[in-house]
A protein has these predicted regions:
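Conserved catalytic-core segment of nucleotide-activated headgroup transferases in glycan assembly
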Residues: 155-205
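Nucleotide-activated donor-binding/catalytic signature segment of Leloir-type glycosyltransferases, i.e.
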Residues: 198-224, 231
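Acidic donor-binding loop of glycosyltransferase active sites
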Residues: 224-240, 250-253
């Protein structure tokens, strides 16, 4: 890639999804984001893509395609190649935790990585995995800040959080997670707060008490709920990166992360426990990791000046990538 190109004003970029915290954080100033702002994005329809490709310069795919059958993503990639519009692909997940097996996502990645002009990802470990599995070189671009701490809102020392969302294959044993996290919290001199999404019931074997409480998880104030914790457990047995981890870095909450994926690459200051798709949850490991997390002071919220510099650098990389793929197409 040529040195230091900048995104010219008016480069028209389709972002899929149109908007989310990460997409908004990385989009350079001066770029024209092309809608419509709806989900699923109509740009994932090959017919829509073919009909409207003349009005855009770049398609940048982040996520939002996991629901599509394998052959539809292959057809979409073929259509994009025929239009000549360059694809920039950010690989957020190498194993989609929302899917029961890895087969569909692997097929999606194979088609998309074969089509993309430029591949981005969030950690060196993920870039190495992409090179090993798919033969593509990915540019590592850090996940930028997506939250700010609430002024004056303190954390309770020893308070551990665990969120139980809509049941999925990535969390096959929520009761086992609660049991091990509760044991670790108590062994570390603390207590456990379990957050429940709407419609999710607490595991029936655990009643609330002095060491265990249940709270509704509030999407609009989730960063503040995380800020009140000393530590939080990420429960998935599969996945690659976590935006929730970045929120915790921003607000100053320690993360207890599973051994799957590249969470420790994303933020070195995590405590890891054994939980992956092949071997499952090791409850003794989670118990010990939670207790160990409580022996350490909660991390300070990420320095806002450093986070602002990081975001500017991330946007500069995206501007450079967009300018380069547009120039390559014109040449």
């Amino acid at each position: 890639m040529n040195a230091e190109p900048s995104a010219g004003p008016g480069i028209r970029v389709v972002t899929v999804p149109y908007s989310d915290p990460h997409v908004d954080a990385v989009l350079p100033e001066g770029v024209v984001r092309v809608g419509p702002a709806q989900g699923p994005s109509p740009w994932l329809d090959p017919a829509y893509l073919a009909a409207h490709a003349g009005g855009v310069d770049v398609v940048h795919l982040h996520s939002g395609y996991g629901h599509l059958p394998e052959d539809e993503v292959v057809s979409w990639a073929e259509t994009l190649r025929r239009t000549g519009v360059p694809l920039v692909l950010t690989v957020h997940q190498l194993r989609d935790p929302q899917q029961a097996t890895r087969r569909r996502h692997d097929a999606h990645l194979e088609a998309l990585l074969a089509t993309a002009e430029v591949v981005l990802t969030l950690t060196p470990g993920a870039a190495d995995e992409i090179a090993e599995r798919f033969g593509r070189t990915a540019i590592v671009v850090a996940h930028p800040s997506i939250a700010e701490p609430v002024p004056g809102l303190g954390a309770e020392r020893g308070l551990v959080g665990l969120a139980l969302r809509t049941p999925c294959a990535a969390v096959p044993d929520p009761a086992g997670l609660v049991r091990a996290a509760l044991s670790g919290a108590v062994n570390g001199g603390g207590r456990l707060r379990v957050f429940l999404d709407d419609g999710v019931e607490p595991p029936p074997v655990f009643a609330a008490g002095d060491s265990l409480e249940y709270r509704p998880r509030k999407a609009d104030s989730w960063p503040a709920q995380l800020q009140e914790l000393h530590a939080v457990v990420l429960p998935e047995c599969c996945g690659t990166h976590s935006p929730e981890l970045e929120v915790c870095r921003d607000v100053g909450t320690r993360v207890v992360a599973p051994s799957c994926g590249w969470f420790a690459d994303q933020w070195a200051d995590v405590v890891t426990y054994d939980n992956d798709e092949e071997r499952g949850l090791d409850p003794v490991s989670l118990d010990a990791a939670v207790a160990a997390a409580l022996t350490r002071p909660a991390p300070r919220p990420a320095d806002r000046a450093w986070r602002a510099e990081q975001r500017a650098a991330v946007r500069a990389v995206h501007a450079q990538v967009y300018a380069q793929v547009v120039a390559d197409r014109a040449g």
